Regions:
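Aromatic-anchored, charged helix-turn/loop surface patch used as a conserved interaction hotspot
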Residues: 142-143, 147-184
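Active-site "lid/cap" and pocket-lining segments within catalytic core domains
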Residues: 1-141, 151
């Protein structure tokens, strides 16, 4: 997604499409490791932390990311466009790829290309077999672009991390900000 040192945003969308259409690079056969001693990292018990009651933690790693992607594109994702916004249905209907994209275990290009391949497969299905898949893949593809659009906006205008994007919002709520609510 992000293109560094753009002089302006004109043509960003076309550049994004061009980048996403390129083939995924092959992984290197080996990486040179760094020989460095590491200090002991304490575990939860040593830090006197309670065990985490969350039973549905996602598995990390590349294989888990690829499995989630495939499962979303072929099973869970059919209701995506209608179910992504509800806390009741989103867990099962969304891709759950955010952590994998953030940590780089899958790339935006991989996800985009896989989505496009799935869109083509769906297009070739008989009409009665398509279900809600065309809408789901269109919505998901749009969200991928939207994600990259806003990352690009942050790259081009880093001030928006701390300032309002539009100056008309300056002063709108500063006088009613409550530190206690924010910290909660």
């Amino acid at each position: 997604g992000v293109i560094r040192c753009l002089s302006d945003r004109d043509g960003w969308s076309a550049k994004w499409y061009d980048r996403m259409k390129k083939p995924v690079l092959e992984a290197p056969e080996a990486l040179q490791s760094i020989e460095e001693a590491s200090e002991h990292l304490p575990d939860a018990d040593e830090l006197c932390l309670q065990s985490d009651p969350v039973a549905t933690l996602q598995k990390g790693g590349r294989l888990a990311g690829l499995e989630l992607l495939s499962n979303f594109l072929h099973e869970r994702g059919e209701g995506y466009s209608k179910e992504m916004s509800s806390p009741v249905t989103a867990f099962d209907s969304c891709s759950r790829l955010s952590a994998h994209l953030a940590f780089g275990t899958v790339s935006m290009r991989e996800v985009s290309l896989a989505c496009e391949r799935r869109r083509q497969q769906i297009k070739e299905m008989p009409r009665g077999m398509k279900g809600k898949w065309p809408s789901a893949m269109r919505s998901f593809s749009g969200r991928l672009r939207w994600h990259c659009h806003f990352l690009q906006k942050l790259e081009d205008e880093p001030r928006i991390e701390f300032e309002n994007m539009h100056p008309d919002y300056d002063g709108l709520r500063e006088n009613v900000f409550n530190d206690l609510f924010f910290e909660a």
